[in-house]
């Protein structure tokens, strides 16, 4: 366990560096995620956001640095290693099997079995009951049966199913990669509500988005990357403006703006 571990830290990434060939994607980036916290991870295209979360989710290796989960140093070889440590990633396309029901998608690959288990029969009734509870917990107010195929759901509802799956399997950290992209206004507000409900249920989130307005509505703290480096941390959206953060993202100094 790292000597300066804080008990409220879920994840700590220290001095993460990553090269793609000769191109440096990340340069000594350090971040922490605390319990019951929604982090907004912002930056322009090429800033390093996607690379950072792929490293944290076990999807790509890194060249140097350290990752700690609850103070324990880890080395993820693949995404299953990250999931086993309580890190679940929800991508823009939700990674759901549209032909299967909501309940089957929630438990996909981790289906409960009927007793005796030697027959390997899935307990569909148990899955339906738990999926119904989860839909209400994330904030879906419509009466959608858990047997409904995912193909019948809207984009926002599909994101809710993915969030529900992460919540059910006790993920400490849910990484949301562009969860509101290509969604309408009403669906976007629904997804933001689902994210808040996840935090209120004891989960932390990293929220990656290009739309700063969405980020400001839901996060507790903002981290900004630029050209592979962390340029801002501990930004409180209640104490800062969207314009302030935009200037940090683009590299325009606030003192220069004041002189104009």
Say what each PLM segment does.
Residues 2-260:
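Glycine-rich phosphate-binding loops of nucleotide-dependent enzymes
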């Amino acid at each position: 366990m790292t000597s300066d571990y804080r008990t409220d830290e879920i994840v700590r990434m220290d001095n993460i560096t990553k090269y793609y060939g000769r191109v440096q994607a990340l340069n000594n980036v350090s971040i922490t995620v605390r319990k019951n916290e929604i982090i907004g991870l912002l930056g322009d295209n090429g800033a390093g956001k996607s690379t950072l979360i792929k490293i944290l989710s076990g999807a790509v290796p890194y060249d140097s640095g350290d990752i700690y989960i609850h103070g324990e140093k880890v080395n993820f070889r693949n995404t299953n290693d990250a999931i086993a440590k309580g890190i679940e990633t929800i991508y823009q396309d939700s990674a759901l099997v549209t032909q299967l029901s909501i309940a089957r998608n929630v438990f996909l690959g981790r289906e409960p079995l009927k007793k005796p288990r030697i027959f390997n029969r899935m307990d569909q009734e148990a899955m339906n009951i738990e999926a119904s509870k989860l839909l209400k917990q994330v904030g879906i107010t419509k009466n959608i049966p858990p047997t409904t195929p995912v193909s019948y759901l809207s984009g926002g509802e599909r994101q809710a199913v993915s969030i529900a799956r992460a919540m059910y399997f006790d993920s400490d950290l849910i990484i949301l990669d562009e969860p509101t992209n290509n969604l309408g206004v009403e669906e976007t507000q629904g997804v933001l509500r689902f994210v808040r409900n996840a935090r209120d249920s004891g989960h932390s989130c990293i929220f990656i988005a290009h739309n700063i307005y969405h980020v400001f509505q839901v996060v507790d703290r903002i981290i900004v990357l630029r050209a592979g480096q962390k340029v801002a941390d501990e930004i409180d959206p209640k104490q800062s403006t969207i314009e302030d953060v935009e200037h940090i993202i683009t590299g325009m100094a606030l003192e220069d703006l004041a002189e104009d």
